[in-house]
Amino acid sequence: MQELAECGAQGIITNSYIIYKNPGLKKKAIAEGIHAMLGWEGPIMTDSGTFQSHVYGEIDMEPDVILDFQKKMGVDIGTVLDVFTEPGTRFREASKELEETQKRIEEADQNKGDMLLAAPIQGGRHLDLRHKAATAASETNADLFPIGGVVPLMEQNKFQRLAEVVFSSKKGLDISRPVHLFGCGHPMLFALAVFMG
């Protein structure tokens, strides 16, 4: 963590689902708090496990359980357990998955406590669904908006589609709140991500 601080990092992101699923880490995170456990004094954001569902398939986790765990660990920014909509998902199925994600965001908004809330924007490759998701999320008290479900586009170098997804999402978002691009960790993408806002 010292090296991160020396490089100028001001905050870090880790994964609450992975911590939760490891009994030793789970116990330590609740007992000590996430900041002490990781040895990091700055802001900590946790993801909810949604990406693991993309990588491994179905995950065994309830949205309210992982939200509560993020609060118990004392994270600064917790993330809603959204539904990862794959880019190839057809419109009807993507719409159903988006409805579930929106329901979870609304429930988390009511139960976030003092924790800042990240409300992921989903919708697959369907630009109208992305805009709809962003507009609905902006009507909640969520504190920031990660654009999710885009890692496959990055991995396949589909940068035009990535830009279309981001711009369609951003058109519906409240411009006074920050936007995060989930999965954008490769330096090659940083300039594009900054350009997209």
PLM features per residue range, with description:
Residues 99, 111-197:
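Glycine-rich phosphate/ribose-binding loops and adjacent secondary-structure elements
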